[in-house]
C-alpha cells in the first residue's frame, strides 16, 4: 500500500523497476501501472539473482520501503553496486544504511514519509559530485565476516574480563 499510495512515485519523470512476486493485488496494480506508463514503470515478477544484480548495477537508487525487515541483505548488495537504498528505518536496514550518507531513511510507514525520503534523495542526486561521494562511501561499506568476527571476539573477551572481575 505504501508504494501504491505514493503521490510522488507515480508522478515523477523517473523510471521504476519492480522485481519479484508478491501479493496478487499488488502484482495486478503494478502490472496495470506498467501498461499505463511503459516508459516509467517496469515489472518483472519472476525473480532471478542474475537479474537482481543487473538491476542493482544499473540503478541509481534502490527502493526498500519495508514494513519490517529482520535482517536484509538486499540493501547491502545494493550499496556494493553504488545503488543507494531508500528504505524505512527498521531492522537490518536501520543497521546497515546511514541516512544521507550511504542511503536514505524514513521512519513512519506512510506514503507521505516515503515521498519525503525520495524527494530528499532526488535533491541530493541533483548534485553529481556529492552523489558520487555518497556512492563511493556506500560501495566501501564493509559487511564482511572478518569485521563481524573481530567484533564478536571483542565482546567475548569483555565478557570473560567481567566474569573474572566478579570472582
Show which residues each predicted segment covers.
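Short hydrophobic beta-strand element within catalytic cores of glycosyltransferases
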Residues: 84-88
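A charged, aromatic-enriched C-terminal amphipathic alpha-helix characteristic of glycosyltransferases
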Residues: 126-154
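Acidic donor-binding loop of glycosyltransferase active sites
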Residues: 57-70
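Nucleotide-activated donor-binding/catalytic signature segment of Leloir-type glycosyltransferases, i.e.
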Residues: 10-54
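Short glycine/serine-rich donor-binding loops of glycosyltransferases
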Residues: 72-75, 93
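Short glycine/acidic-rich beta->alpha loop that forms part of the nucleotide-sugar donor binding site
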Residues: 69-72, 79
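Short acidic alpha-helix that forms the nucleotide-activated donor recognition element
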Residues: 49-58, 98, 113-115
Amino acid at each position: 500500500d505504501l508504494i501504491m499510495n505514493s503521490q510522488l512515485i507515480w508522478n515523477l519523470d523517473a523510471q521504476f523497476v519492480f522485481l519479484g512476486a508478491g501479493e496478487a493485488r499488488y502484482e495486478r496494480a503494478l502490472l496495470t501501472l506498467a501498461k499505463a506508463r511503459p516508459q516509467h514503470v517496469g515489472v518483472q515478477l519472476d525473480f532471478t539473482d542474475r537479474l537482481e544484480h543487473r538491476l542493482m548495477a544499473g540503478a541509481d537508487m534502490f527502493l526498500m520501503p519495508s514494513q519490517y525487515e529482520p535482517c536484509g541483505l538486499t540493501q547491502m548488495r545494493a550499496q556494493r553496486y553504488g545503488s543507494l537504498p531508500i528504505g524505512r528505518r527498521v531492522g537490518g536496514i536501520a543497521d546497515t544504511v546511514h541516512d544521507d550518507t550511504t542511503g536514505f531513511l524514513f521512519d513512519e510507514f506512510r506514503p507521505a514519509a516515503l515521498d519525503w525520503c525520495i524527494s530528499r534523495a532526488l535533491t541530493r542526486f541533483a548534485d553529481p559530485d556529492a552523489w558520487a561521494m555518497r556512492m563511493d562511501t556506500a560501495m566501501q561499506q564493509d559487511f564482511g565476516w572478518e569485521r563481524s568476527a573481530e567484533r564478536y571476539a571483542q565482546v567475548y573477551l569483555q565478557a570473560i574480563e567481567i566474569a573474572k572481575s566478579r570472582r
